[in-house]
Amino acid sequence: MTLRPSFDYTSAIAAVCSDMCYRIPELRHIDMNRVAVGFSQTKNSEPFGVFASTTPLRFENGESYCNRRGRFWTLQQLFRPDGVEYLYILYFYVPRFIELPLSQKLDTIVHELYHVNPFFNGDLRRFAGRRFAHGSKKQYDKIVNGLVQYWLKSNPPNDIWEFLCYNYRDLMTKYGKLSGTRIPFPKVIPAKTN
């Protein structure tokens, strides 16, 4: 019996993200070397709920600390093995994300990347109004769809994104096992004061 290697799903998604950030001008400010990509397991694959999320590792305007009710707080830091600090974490919720059709997977990936602040400062892109993370959902979705279409028209290599065509069962049949990086959600913690 020959053992098949597992398929590293988070590394594959990170490669798609890198290609999108290279090809789409509106995403070129993103340095994927400073964006961690992980997965979180969902209880089921129902097409309801969250498919992915972007977690900023800084507060508003890229600040490392915030003051709430007279106390200073910071976020837990996350580093690459070479010591470079991550500024964002992209989480993909599996198997829920995997069960989406290709078009929705691409929309979801670009949707999350577009949350990254244009100054790449660890904060989210902010819009005017109460819904600072999206502004108008209709307008946000229109922008995302346009960026996905731009990426597809740029003819990205099939070997980078073809795995997104598969659902969970197809991936298991093709690769035998899925693997990926699990990253604990960072906590807001009291800041050390000198």
Predicted feature locations:
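Short pre-active-site segment immediately N-terminal to the catalytic Zn-binding motif
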Residues: 91-108
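Metalloprotease/metallohydrolase-associated module, dominated by Zn2+-dependent proteases
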Residues: 1-91, 119-194
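Active-site recognition of the HExxH zinc-binding catalytic motif
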Residues: 105-119
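Generic "edge-of-domain/loop-turn" microfeature
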Residues: 44, 97-99, 115
